[in-house]
């Protein structure tokens, strides 16, 4: 067994929210285009009434994926700790909030749920017995600007070591190990009327040495000194949040606890290589380690562009398939 490919429907946010496809039609199109077999769904985005899952939806969903020969790989669940305006959720409330979503994952046949940092390590700790009972693994998504050793991540790693449960794991997001800011993002800034000099200033700090917080603060200070508006400063700062520069080889450190992967991507060059993420380098880390699980192709360009996602998903699968097939033969 080896790394298996799939798609998260989050990649198709514009197609779904723009009413170009129903949920059922999206799933069918994923299968038709050969960008499965793994299927990742974000609960609150795709399932009406979530986390309550009706028996009818359960029946229809299972029939749908069986008909199209797809496999449930991961269910994206939310922490939503600030869902109330007056206060944040208590730990007890958050545990119950997560348990309902984990139960939904089990009901629909998802073996993994994607969890978020705001849940906090204590909530994750208390969820372990429930996850073990329902046979659903908890995968904390490591997403830029966090790293494996950031203040966000270390408390979870320490708790994982204490609890030592196979149902606690991680979901690496490849945007954390980017090598460049993709053209889609640069073009979006230009279309918004941001001067290229301002974009170049942000890029110079993004590519500099140092911790992400220091580089981001350095850019913001320089941008304000240069007279850029607060709106432009905030827009350009987003590149520091979405794209990290962690070395791909660092993923090996948590490999035994990786339960799913988000194969983040944006743009391709004329040779079919992904511009922002060095896929030959990053996939080699997982293939060399013998990772046996799914990677969801995750196109996030819909934040910046209305360009259709299906063709890009096909390119991403073609790239990753070639790397998987060629592994060990170089």
Protein language model features and the residues they cover:
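Active-site beta-loop-alpha junctions enriched in small/polar residues
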Residues: 8-14, 42-44, 77-80, 118-120, ...
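Active-site acidic/histidine proton-transfer and metal-coordination neighborhood
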Residues: 64-71, 81-172, 176-220
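Short amphipathic alpha-helices and their capping/turn segments at secondary-structure boundaries
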Residues: 24-31, 54-69, 154-166, 245-253, ...
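Aromatic-rich peripheral "rim/lid" segments of glycoside hydrolase catalytic domains that contact
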Residues: 285, 289, 296, 300-330
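Hydrophobic faces of well-ordered beta-strands that scaffold small-molecule active sites
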Residues: 3-9, 37-41, 72-77, 113-115, ...
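Glycine-rich, proline-tolerant flexible connector loops at the mouths of alpha/beta enzymes
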Residues: 37-63, 303
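Catalytic domains of carbohydrate-active enzymes, especially glycoside hydrolases
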Residues: 21-44, 103-112
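Gly/Pro-rich active-site loop or hairpin
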Residues: 12-23, 52, 149-153, 180-292, ...
């Amino acid at each position: 067994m080896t790394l298996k490919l799939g798609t998260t429907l989050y990649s198709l946010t514009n197609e779904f929210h723009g009413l170009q496809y129903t949920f059922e039609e999206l799933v069918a199109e994923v299968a038709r285009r050969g960008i499965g077999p793994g299927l990742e769904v974000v609960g609150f985005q795709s399932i009406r009434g979530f986390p309550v899952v009706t028996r009818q939806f359960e029946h229809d969903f299972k029939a749908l994926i069986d008909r199209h020969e797809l496999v449930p790989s991961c269910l994206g669940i939310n922490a939503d700790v600030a869902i109330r305006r007056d206060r944040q959720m208590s730990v007890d409330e958050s545990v119950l909030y997560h348990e309902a979503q984990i139960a939904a994952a089990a009901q629909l046949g998802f073996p993994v749920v994607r969890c978020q940092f705001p849940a906090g390590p204590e909530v994750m700790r208390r969820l372990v017995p429930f996850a073990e009972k329902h046979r659903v693994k908890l995968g904390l998504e490591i997403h830029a600007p966090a790293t494996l050793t950031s203040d966000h991540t270390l408390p979870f790693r320490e708790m994982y070591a204490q609890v030592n449960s196979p149902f606690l794991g991680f979901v690496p997001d490849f945007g954390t190990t980017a090598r460049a800011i993709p053209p889609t993002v640069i073009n979006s800034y230009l279309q918004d009327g941001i001067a290229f000099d301002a974009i170049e200033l942000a890029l110079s700090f993004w590519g500099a040495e140092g911790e992400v917080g220091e580089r981001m603060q350095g850019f913001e200070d320089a941008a304000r000194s240069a007279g850029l508006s607060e709106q432009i400063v905030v827009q350009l700062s987003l590149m520091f949040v979405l794209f990290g520069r962690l070395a791909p080889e660092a993923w090996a450190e948590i490999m035994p606890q990786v339960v799913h992967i988000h194969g983040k991507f944006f743009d391709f060059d004329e040779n079919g290589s992904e511009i922002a993420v060095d896929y030959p380098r990053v996939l080699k880390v997982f293939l060399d380690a013998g990772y046996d699980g799914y990677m969801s192709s995750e196109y996030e360009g819909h934040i910046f562009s209305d360009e259709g996602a299906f063709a890009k998903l096909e390119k991403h699968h073609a790239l990753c398939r070639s790397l998987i097939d060629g592994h060990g033969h170089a």
